[in-house]
Amino acid sequence: MYRITLSEQARKEYLYFTQSGNKAILNKIKTLSEDIAAHPYTGIGKPEPLKYELAGKWSRRINAEHRIVYSVHDDTIEVYIFSMRYHYSKK
C-alpha cells in the first residue's frame, strides 16, 4: 500500500467538500483514495497520465466536474495528492 499525502490545496478542497455536506462526493473521494493507495496506476475513476505542463502527474475522476490529481513516488511508496476540486484545466 502506498502512503497518501495531501497538499495544502488538497486539504482545503477536502474541507470544502466536508463542509458542503455532499456525501456522494466524500464517499467517492474515500473510495478513490483507497484504490489509489492500493494500485495508483490502475483501477476505478479512469486513471490517466497527464500531459504537457502536468506531465508526471495522474488524474482520476470523482465526477464530471472534479478530479483527483496526484503524483506517484515509487521509491518512497507514496502518493502525493495535489488537488481534488474542479477539473485540472481550471487551475
What are these regions (language model features)?
Residues 34-61:
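A short, surface-exposed loop/turn module that caps and links secondary-structure elements
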Residues 3, 9-26, 59-67, 71-91:
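Enriched for short, Lys/Arg-rich terminal
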Residues 3-4, 43:
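Residues that recognize and position ribonucleotide moieties
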Residues 19-39:
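A short, compositionally biased N-terminal segment around positions ~18-40 that is enriched
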